Amino acid sequence: MSILSFLLGEKKKSASVAKERLQIILAHERTGHSAPADYLPALQRELVAVISKYVKISDQDLRVSLERQDNLEVLEVKIEIPQN
């Protein structure tokens, strides 16, 4: 980070904001404070909003799921991008 960007401030990129949010969600989930289904719909809506800035997609084009196998958790995001 340069001194100029430090003094003037720098706007965070949407990718870094999304990464921070996912890290918070996963950390919260690992502590056992909420059921996984609680945040998945909100996460899906936010992802659609961010991706829609760059590619035209609908709510049905994006699917978010969380699977648990033993002590492994997998957050899966599937996005169907139109051919046009």
From Swiss-Prot:
GO biological process: cell division; regulation of division septum assembly
Keyword set, alphabetical order: Cell cycle, Cell division
UniProt key word Cell cycle: yes
Pfam family, one: MinE
Residues in coiled coil: none
Function field: Prevents the cell division inhibition by proteins MinC and MinD at internal division sites while permitting inhibition at polar sites. This ensures cell division at the proper site by restricting the formation of a division septum at the midpoint of the long axis of the cell.
Family: Belongs to the MinE family.
Name this protein carries in UniProt: Cell division topological specificity factor
The species this protein was found in: Cupriavidus pinatubonensis (strain JMP 134 / LMG 1197) (Cupriavidus necator (strain JMP 134))
Lineage: Bacteria, Pseudomonadati, Pseudomonadota, Betaproteobacteria, Burkholderiales
